[in-house]
Each structure stands twice: as structure tokens, then as C-alpha cells.
A protein has these predicted regions:
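Conserved class I S-adenosyl-L-methionine
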Residues: 1-41, 43-52, 139-164
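Class I SAM-dependent methyltransferase SAM/SAH-binding core
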Residues: 53-98
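A short acidic, Gly/Pro-enriched loop at the edge of an enzyme's catalytic core
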Residues: 97-108
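A short, conserved alpha-helix within the catalytic core of class I
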Residues: 116-128
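Short glycine-dipeptide loop
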Residues: 132-138
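Short alpha-helix
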Residues: 173-192
Length: 207
């Protein structure tokens, strides 16, 4: 199975269940939410790449003027539209490498290692830069190399036995591939950016 097929089979629903998450992963997810609220411009226009079921934008509803979430998986977008409590939130099915939007945004997000599961990272980064052109407004969170042990346990809890671990990725028996990064590799892919640690297992890159 490809990553697209694994997500279509409902991996995200299981992964967001705290009962499946090792403590290091739960701590990262909590810290990511706090950072996001600190960094997203108040009353800003925000686009979320790989938004899943919309949890990040829904969590920011009280501080943003507009939120647009995009994801290729229509079942997640349908659930995001069902869950949204109203307000200026919009969720749509789209290819993250060719987003059908022309508006300018104050921030572009790609969170919770979504970027680390995408095949064409540079094309997606290009779209993030197009929609949020100001330096420092593209926010990407990815797993660090130190995340391998808790992620291995997490994926096992999700029914995805790990069959391969390299310096750059974990591969499971179901075909799911999730990458991890060093600061050097992040800079080689993103270019000029500010990188900060999120707990012990992840990085935030502001590009």
C-alpha cells in the first residue's frame, strides 16, 4: 500500500486516539498546539496543507480571520466540514502540489510530520511560498531522528508493524512510510529557515 492508500484506510482516525500514543508523541502534539497559537498571526488568513480532519484550524478558530484546509483524502475533508463549528473555515479536496487558490495568506501550515509523508516535498513547499510569500510565515513540523523509538511503538499500536528503519524513514508492513529529519537535512531541503526543537522528538521549521 502507498501512503495515500494507508490514509484512505483510516490511519489518521486511529492515530489521533490518545490511547494509541506513547507519552512522547502526546507531549509533542500538545506542544505543537501551543506553539501554533503563539505563532499564527492574530486575525490572520491561514492555509493548512494536509489538514486531515481540520483539527488545527478548528483549534485556531478564535484567533484567525480565515482558515482554509486542503487534503487529497475526501473522507477527511468531509469529516472536517462536519466537525467545524461554523465561522470562517473552509475545507476542500485538492492536490497540495497544485492548490486551486490565488488569495494571499498570512501563514501556511504543514504540521504533525505531514510533510514527512509527502512524496513531492519541494513542490508543496513551493505552493506554501506562493500562498504565504512573507519570510517566516511557512510553518512546518516534522519528526526528528530521536523520534524513532516512540514512533515505532505508536505504529505498532496502530497495527502497522515496523519492518525497516533507516537514517531518513520508518517503513511499516502495511507500506506506510514516515520520514524523520536532522537539522542539516531540513535545511538542505527547505533552504534558509529557523529551526527549533519541539520536545524531544520533533522540529519546527519557519521558512
Amino acid at each position: 500500500m502507498t501512503n495515500d492508500q494507508v490514509y484512505a484506510a483510516g490511519l489518521l482516525n486511529k492515530a489521533l486516539d490518545p490511547a494509541t500514543q506513547p507519552e512522547a508523541i502526546r507531549a509533542f502534539l500538545r506542544a505543537e498546539e501551543v506553539l501554533l497559537r503563539e505563532l499564527v498571526p492574530r486575525r490572520g488568513r491561514v492555509v493548512d496543507f494536509g489538514c486531515g480532519m481540520g483539527r488545527h484550524l478548528i483549534g485556531l478558530l478564535d484567533v484567525i480571520a480565515l482558515g482554509v484546509g486542503i487534503d487529497y483524502e475526501w473522507t477527511y475533508i468531509a469529516e472536517a466540514n462536519r466537525l467545524k463549528p461554523g465561522g470562517p473555515l473552509h475545507f476542500l479536496v485538492a492536490d497540495a502540489t497544485r492548490v486551486p487558490l490565488r488569495s494571499r495568506f498570512d501563514a501556511a501550515l504543514c504540521l504533525t510530520n505531514t510533510w514527512g509523508t509527502m512524496s513531492d516535498k519541494l513542490a508543496i513547499l513551493g505552493e506554501m511560498r506562493r500562498l504565504a510569500p512573507e519570510t517566516g510565515t511557512r510553518l512546518i513540523t516534522v519528526y526528528a531522528s530521536t523520534s524513532v523509538a516512540p514512533r515505532r511503538q505508536w505504529y505498532t499500536n496502530l497495527g502497522h508493524e515496523v519492518v525497516e528503519i533507516t537514517d531518513e524513514h520508518i517503513r511499516t508492513s502495511g507500506g506506510f512510510v514516515s520520514e524523520h529529519f536532522t537539522e542539516g537535512r531540513l535545511r538542505s531541503l527547505i533552504g534558509d529557515c529557523a529551526i527549533s526543537a519541539i520536545g524531544d522528538v520533533a522540529y519546527l521549521a519557519q521558512a
